[in-house]
């Protein structure tokens, strides 16, 4: 369970719902995920009220407008960013996003929790890394640049560059 302070006194942000086995490109699966996560929210509030001191009267103020899907499709670009590029803190000649630093946040595909292989502990970056422009140029489409989570990268690399600060960095670089 992740609890983050909110701007208003007495409020916190909770990040805890999880659903697996969905296809993020399927409307039916996304609907099922919405239902599962909303049911989880009710149970989470009940748990907080019963077991966490200070949360006896807690309630949901708001929630995301739709379920967040961690990963779906990736384009094939001129270069595929790998976890080894990140671990080695590679600085590419054609970088468009640099000074990126985040942990590997691989969630299990089999159930709640982090990756059962412990990738988040095995892969430690030597420092800040860059993302090459080539990751943003699709192999088979003209007139399109990729930005954010859909750039070309391995599953493990994606667990690192998918976070908002790095996606914003990529977007700024591609759009400039």
How would you describe each model-predicted region?
Residues 1-176:
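Flavin (FAD/FMN)-binding glycine-rich loop and adjacent Rossmann-like elements that form
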């Amino acid at each position: 369970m992740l609890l983050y302070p909110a701007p208003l006194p007495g409020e916190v942000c909770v990040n805890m719902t999880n659903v697996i086995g969905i296809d993020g490109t399927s409307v039916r699966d996304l609907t099922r995920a919405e239902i599962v996560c909303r049911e989880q929210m009710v149970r989470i509030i009940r748990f907080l009220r019963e077991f966490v001191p200070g949360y006896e009267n807690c309630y949901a103020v708001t929630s995301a407008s739709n379920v967040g899907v961690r990963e779906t499709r990736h384009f094939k670009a001129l270069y595929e960013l790998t976890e080894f590029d990140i671990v080695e803190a590679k600085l590419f000649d054609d970088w468009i996003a640099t000074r990126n630093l985040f942990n590997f946040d691989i969630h299990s595909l089999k159930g709640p929790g982090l990756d059962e292989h412990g990738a988040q502990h095995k892969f430690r970056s030597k420092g800040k890394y860059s993302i090459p422009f080539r990751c943003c140029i699709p192999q088979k489409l003209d007139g399109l640049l990729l930005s954010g989570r859909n750039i070309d990268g391995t599953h493990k690399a994606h667990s690192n560059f998918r976070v908002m600060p790095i996606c914003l960095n990529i977007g700024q670089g591609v759009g400039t």
